[in-house]
Structure formats: structure tokens, C-alpha cells
Design a protein with these regions (language model features):
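Structured-RNA-binding interfaces characteristic of tRNA pseudouridine synthases
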Residues: 14-239
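Short linear segments in intrinsically disordered or otherwise low-structure-confidence regions
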Residues: 2-4, 8
Length: 239
């Protein structure tokens, strides 16, 4: 790929002069608070994260981009590292995408990283694994400030027993019975690589790692359930 012609920023507006060049493929790592969205994918019944990202790209480059994603989160679901990709003819420097898109995105969506990747990279089909995290606030009284981010359950939960039982899911299995509206995939076989259930004394939802596990496995009000697989069927994790 040839050297890109420079893109210049207006000192007053900060807008880029997106001079055209050969087609480029841009991979974005996006974090968002899904509280105000009906999901990632474009839908007619409310705002979606995909629309917010595509509008920001249009304002930046003047192009109508179709943004692909590694996963399609549902209504109210958040993401720490959603991977997305789109193609563009813009010559904007790669770091300019991250900075400028964040200016055009709403406050609850942010591009954490932007990288130019080969044209055959596809955010959906190039994904090799996905990680989902569910957080249960296991205490007598719920915290109203966490209502959009955790599920409150007041009765005692044996997280150690949950973790032990969940290990039966690890491995390559036919998860047909876990899927709703079957069949909507060519195969219902998936490989679950890891399932962990552990308690935490704190709830740093914005961190990629749950942090240190308490010395007492039954300590901590927050139960973190994480599952990693090569892919998931529709409603498979919820089941």
C-alpha cells in the first residue's frame, strides 16, 4: 500500500481535510454504556450504538460507512472492548480517527483504539473468541446507582458451587438446547474455553480484569460470572 497523502486539520474547527486515497480498512475498539441504547445493531425502534458510530464517521469523512462488529449486544448491554471495522477512502492519519471520532460521538460511546488492518479483516468473521461478563450484586439491599450495571439478588448464592457446576460447560458441545428460535445458525456446536464464577469486594465494571479474588471465596458482595467461547448462539449465555 502506497504512502498516504497528508490530511490537514483546520486550526479553528479541528476538522480534517479527508483527501482521498486507496481503500483502507479501519479496526476500532469501542467502549460504551448501553443504558440509553436498544442494542448495537441498527433497529427501527430506538437509538443504537452502530448508528452513533456511523454518524460520527459520516461527520468526519463525509462517507456513508457500514460498520461491522464482532458481536451484537442487546438493549441495555454495555461493552468494554467491542471490535468494529469499516472501510474508507479517507487519508486521515490513523490516530486522527480515534481523536476525531470521539469528538463526534456521544459521551456514552468512546473509541479506545483505532488501527489500520488488511482489507480482508472482517470484525464479525475474523473474531476468534468473545467474552461476556455478568455481575450479580448479592446483598440484602440493592444499590440504586448500580441498577443499570448489575443484577441484584438478595438471597445467598453459593458462588463456589456455581463455579464448579459451570465447568461442565467447558469444551466443545452441541448447545442446541440453550438456543432460542432454533435453528438460526448452520451449526449449534460451540467451544466454551473458560467459565469463571467468583466473588469480588468491589465492582469496577470499567476494568477489563475483575482484579484480585478475595482470600475468602465466599467474601464479597459482587459475583462475577465470565464466559469465553469461540461464539455464542442466540440467547445461549442467558439460558
Amino acid at each position: 500500500m502506497g504512502r498516504a497523502r497528508p490530511a490537514f486539520a483546520d486550526s479553528d474547527t479541528g476538522h480534517f481535510d479527508a483527501r482521498k486515497r486507496d481503500m483502507r480498512n479501519i479496526r476500532l475498539t469501542i467502549a460504551y454504556d448501553g443504558s440509553n441504547y436498544v442494542g448495537w445493531q441498527i433497529q427501527p425502534n430506538g437509538p443504537t450504538v452502530q448508528v452513533a458510530v456511523e454518524k460520527a464517521i459520516k461527520r468526519l469523512t463525509g462517507e456513508e460507512a457500514s460498520v461491522l462488529s464482532a458481536g451484537r449486544t442487546d438493549s441495555g448491554v454495555h461493552a468494554l472492548g467491542q471490535v468494529a471495522s469499516f472501510q474508507t477512502e479517507s487519508a486521515i492519519p490513523i490516530d486522527g480517527f480515534r481523536k476525531a471520532l470521539n469528538k463526534f460521538l456521544p459521551d456514552d460511546v468512546i473509541v479506545r483504539d483505532a488501527e489500520e488492518v488488511p482489507l480482508d479483516f472482517h470484525a464479525t468473521f475474523s473474531a476468534v473468541q468473545k467474552r461476556y461478563r455478568y455481575v450479580i450484586h448479592n446483598c440484602r439491599t440493592h444499590n440504586p446507582f448500580l441498577r443499570n450495571y448489575v443484577w441484584h439478588f438478595h438471597q445467598d448464592i453459593d458462588s463456589v458451587a456455581m463455579h464448579e457446576a459451570a465447568q461442565e460447560l467447558v469444551g466443545k458441545h452441541d448447545f442446541r438446547s440453550f438456543e432460542s428460535h432454533w435453528p438460526n445458525k448452520s451449526s449449534s456446536v460451540r467451544t466454551v474455553k473458560e467459565v469463571t464464577v467468583r466473588r469480588q469486594n468491589f465492582c469496577p465494571l470499567w476494568l477489563g480484569d475483575a482484579g484480585q479474588q478475595p482470600s475468602d471465596e465466599n467474601a464479597g458482595e459482587f459475583i462475577w460470572l465470565e464466559i469465553v467461547a469461540d461464539g455464542f448462539l442466540y440467547n445461549m449465555v442467558r439460558a
